[in-house]
Amino acid sequence: MIRHRLLAAAAVGLLTAVPALPGTALAGPRRDGLRLCALHPLPLPAGVTHGRATAVDPTGRYVAGIGTRITDGVWEPVLLLWQGARVTAVDTALAEDVVGVNSAGVVIGNAYVTAMQRPWRYQDGRLTDLPVPGNVSGAWVAGINGRGDIVGHGAVEATESSIALRWPADRPGTVETIDTPPDGAALAVLDDGTVVGNARFSAGSSSYAGWVRRPGGQVVRLTVPGRPNAWVLAARGGWAAGTTGDDPDGDRSPVRWGLDTGKATVVDPAVEPVQDVTAGGVLLGLRAVWHADGVTPLPGAVAGFPDVQARAVTDTGTAVGWTTTDRLTPVRWTGC
């Protein structure tokens, strides 16, 4: 619930003004059009009429997403997994929310099952529910690393709070609670086991900040000087990316943090809301890519159908998402 609420709250206008913040670096000038950014539709299986690419592994080997099969007027969800030009379709009601895939082709997602949110994993052709602690009323996955460790969070109805969760790859069928600041939610897990997420500043506080938990247990907060709130939405390599604002429902500014220093840099508003970050620190927004030397808009909008939505990016800069015309078309962007 926490991650979904943060993502929804972050979805504000792309042209929000970004004031300079005390103690915060402001990115350089915007220089559009410096890159040859190309759009490539992804193939859909026979009988699947709509599709969205929502996840890609850092190497670009696998892309995962959601399709729709219409049978006798009934729209049925389909889990889609691309490997190059080949696409695998899995008809399942669990394909409501596909949030991650790693370089081994393990896909993770969430679905509403028997009156509660439940996480799942697709691996080696099998869909399985992930275990959840007995004290949570719903659970969500948010990130997976190269070896298959999965992180997310659970909602504890009794205390109206959230706890960060990890499903370790080396202990299949188990789930463990991650020690975090109050009301914690894990958003990403790096290949070395570092976990990144969000939590309240303190118990009872209305302000949020990001956090980084190293494998040894050390926890560092990710904040933006001069702002009461900061939320991490993605992390990879030595970088985290997210958003900052004075009010959870107010204007937002996209931010990049260096995980080694915790330094925050407010970047061009064209990438708000932030969707992903590469190991090299490139930020993906809903409709644009931010590099240190400028911003590149993502092509794909056509007259009457202006919507393109990117969701994830590889470490080599290939982004995936979808375009909207009379149907949803899964796509990838290269050279952006």
Feature annotation, model-predicted:
Residues 1-28:
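Secretory targeting and sorting signals
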Residues 2-5, 26-336:
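Residue-level hotspots at or immediately adjacent to binding/recognition sites across diverse folds
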